[in-house]
Design a protein with these regions (language model features):
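A short, aliphatic-rich beta-strand micro-motif
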Residues: 127-135
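Short, hydrophobic-rich beta-strand element in sensory/regulatory alpha-beta domains
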Residues: 25, 32-66, 72
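Short beta-strand-to-loop transition segments that serve as allosteric relay/switch motifs
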Residues: 79-80, 127, 143-153
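Regulatory loop-to-helix N-cap segments in sensory/regulatory domains
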Residues: 1, 85, 115-118, 147-164
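Regulatory sensory and allosteric helical modules in signal-transduction proteins
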Residues: 65-119
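Signal-transmission linkers at sensory-effector interfaces
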Residues: 1-29, 36
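Flexible loop/coil segments at beta-strand boundaries within sensory signal-transduction domains
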Residues: 68-69, 135-140, 149, 160
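Signal-transmission/dimerization alpha-helices at domain junctions
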Residues: 1, 37, 101-107, 137, ...
Length: 168
């Protein structure tokens, strides 16, 4: 459910988008906002949500779909290692591939429960992830991905808000 904090943040982001000319800068603002406001900040404190040598951090970014190449390219990311800027993922890889194929949102509150989960982040395996497809004029153009290392960071209510941010 959208709370007043999220509504105010969306208002600010939309106002910012109307004044900024660089699309990637606008999308980076969305990535940063989602990392700051979505997810359970106490998830990392629950026993079992972090494994040995893991620490809580989050990432977000947009994978823009390139249908001619059957892949998606990472842009406007927050928290990803610098060497993964413009990372390209084939359409058939992991859960981003599932979203590309089905064009539906996907929530993995605990990635350990999915034996087919593929590690995309070069530096760590994430424990909780949200994927929201993006459309323009009814056409699939990519997806917004947000992930955290602690399992159970993201719940249904976070994913619903994530989808609202994505549709802006």
């Amino acid at each position: 459910k959208l709370g007043s904090l999220h509504l105010e943040q969306l208002r600010q982001l939309i106002t910012y988008a109307q004044t900024e000319n660089d699309v990637e800068t606008i999308l980076k603002a969305f990535s940063a906002a989602v990392i700051k406001t979505l997810g359970d900040p106490s998830a990392a404190k629950t026993p079992g949500n972090l494994k040995k040598n893991e620490h809580q951090f989050s990432v977000a970014g947009f994978f823009l779909h390139i249908p001619q190449r059957k892949e998606s390219c990472l842009v406007a990311e927050q928290g990803f290692p610098a060497e993964q800027h413009r990372l390209r993922i084939p359409d058939d890889v992991g859960h981003p591939g599932w979203v590309t194929k089905h064009k539906k949102p996907l929530l993995l509150s605990n990635t350990d429960e999915y034996s087919d989960f593929k590690q995309i982040l070069k530096s760590a395996r994430m424990g909780s992830a949200m994927y929201s497809p993006m459309f323009s004029n009814g056409n699939f153009i990519g997806q917004f991905i947000t992930a955290s290392q602690a399992r159970q960071t993201y719940r249904i209510q976070d994913h619903e808000i994530h989808q609202v941010y994505t549709s802006c």
